[in-house]
Design a protein with these regions (language model features):
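Short glycine-rich, Thr/Ser-proximal phosphate-binding strand/loop in the N-terminal lobe
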Residues: 10-40, 97-101, 281-305
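Short, compositionally biased low-complexity segments
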Residues: 14, 18-21, 25, 205-209, ...
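A glycine- and small/hydrophobic-rich beta-loop-beta segment
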Residues: 308-373
Length: 471
């Protein structure tokens, strides 16, 4: 089986034995996006990867191909909800877990201009329409559907709101490509993302990827299974499941976190066994879920290098003298480090991207002193935000920079993300560490539907490469 990830910068391939799950080889090539004149094809880079693999493994030339893609801008999703703090926020989380980049979140208070911009300037690939709990208010999602149409939207819509309004909403949007799924927030404090996540994947394959004009060859759409972040998150879920049942782990696993440092964004995927308090309404109206993905659009190695420097400087992670390096990388996204000094600059930008992205995903825990009691003592309350990752057992580093920097440098970056935080950041405290330098997680996500046993074995092989953090 030949598993392919068409990325925005690199096309990565992994050749896997479909019976045993053994990784036979991997190769990468710059992603070949077609030019404005129509020349070139995204499959040119793939052909180069397959030819390279076939030199050592002749069966690669005829292997079955499964692919995912974030090339050409990936999957852009706009969320339309009712209450910003409930259904709109729930929709945003579902969109992220579906592998999309959220480009707009509209709610009841959004004005007419925002809906006009949706069709004219924002131009998402898919609109996710939510609103209302089951048995609750039906007007919100119906109004959202009307406002989408009034703004001139004619693209795909996934409806995942109050089930009582599905027929009316379906009638309103009947002329659009539409899929109606179960409510993502059936009741307050409950988030059910899976049905909508599957519908968004189907929309991506049926209506989105072909419109990006990445290839003129029919085999491109035939090999695609979904958006890259969606398949990677699926791979992380498989990895977490295997760790829980793997006797070699020696104990019950509490979770997995993956930090993926890209050129434009830094993504964090987590699958964590939740504390019962966290699964309910103790902190959030929209419940925390075991499977979470966050995307930081201002953190990255190239296109977002300057905003990474700004964020890193604000948090005391980067110095002023790194700014010229960040400016150069943002202006030249194809830049590759050639000297020790340039590699050291990449290391600093990567470490800042990963650290800040992980902090935003995990949040922090801190003691808040309240009002004095009758006895004269002040009450003390632990205030927590984000998702508690402190007991996570495995921390995985991914992304081109961690593959291309020297191994010891990549390990140093990953090691810096763990440990007890004096500032209360809920980062992994004592995890094992592993670098995904062979594109394994995307391959696991691609394989699991067709070859579940091979996917599980491949995931286990990655976990068994884990190391203990340096002291």
């Amino acid at each position: 089986m030949l598993c392919v990830d068409f990325g925005s910068t690199f096309t990565k391939t992994a050749l896997v034995d479909g019976s045993t799950g053994a990784l036979l080889g991997s190769a990468s090539h710059h992603t070949t996006i077609p030019g404005a004149d129509g020349s070139g094809d995204v499959l040119d880079g793939f052909d180069a990867c397959r030819a390279k693999l076939a030199q050592q493994h002749p069966n690669a030339a005829d292997a079955e191909v499964l692919a995912c893609s974030s090339a050409g801008g990936g999957l852009r999703i706009a969320v339309v909800g009712n209450e910003e703090l409930v259904t709109a926020e729930a929709g945003r989380r579902v969109a992220l877990s579906s592998g999309g980049k959220v480009v707009a979140v509209l709610g009841r208070t959004s004005d007419e201009a925002a809906y006009l911009e949706l069709a004219d300037t924002t131009r998402p690939d898919v609109v996710l329409l939510t609103g209302g709990t089951d048995g609750g208010d039906e007007d919100g999602i119906v109004t959202g559907a009307r406002r989408i149409l009034a703004g001139g939207w004619h693209g795909p819509v996934v409806v995942a709101g109050n089930s009582a309004a599905h027929v009316e909403v379906g009638d309103l949007l009947g002329d659009l490509p539409i899929v109606v799924m179960d409510n993502v927030v059936p009741r307050i404090g409950v988030l059910r993302p899976e049905p909508a996540r599957q519908a968004i994947r189907e929309m991506f394959l049926a209506h989105v990827i072909g419109g990006k004009h990445l290839s003129r060859r029919a085999d491109f759409t035939a090999m695609l299974r979904g958006a890259t972040p969606d398949l990677v998150l699926t791979g992380v879920e498989v990895l977490a499941a295997e760790l829980r049942r793997d006797p070699a782990s020696g104990h019950r696993m509490r979770g997995v976190v993956v930090v993926d440092i890209g050129g434009a964004t830094t993504d964090v995927h987590s699958v964590v066994e939740l504390d019962p308090e966290d699964a309910g309404l103790s902190r959030e109206v929209v419940a925390t879920t075991p499977v979470t993905r966050t995307v930081e659009g201002d953190l990255g190695m190239r296109w977002s290098a300057l905003s990474t420097w700004e964020a890193g400087r604000a948090e005391g992670l980067l110095d002023d003298d790194l700014r010229p390096a960040a400016v150069r990388r943002a202006a030249e996204p194809s830049f590759l480090p050639d000297t020790y000094a340039e590699r050291r600059e990449d290391e600093q930008i990567a470490a800042a991207s990963a650290t800040i992205a992980l902090r935003r995903h995990a949040g922090r825990s801190r003691v808040v002193v309240g009002l004095a009691t009758d006895a004269g003592d002040s009450s003390r309350v632990v205030e927590r935000t984000g998702k508690d990752l402190r007991e996570v057992d495995l921390l995985v580093g991914s992304g081109g920079v961690l593959r291309h920097l020297p191994l010891e440098v990549s390990r140093r970056i990953l090691d810096s993300l763990s440990g007890v935080s004096p500032q209360g950041w809920q980062q992994p405290e004592h995890p094992s560490l592993v670098l995904d330098r062979d594109y394994v997680l995307a391959a696991v996500g691609l394989l699991v539907e067709r070859r579940p046993a091979a996917a599980a074995a491949l995931a286990r092989s990655l976990s068994r490469c884990a190391e203990t953090p340096e002291s």
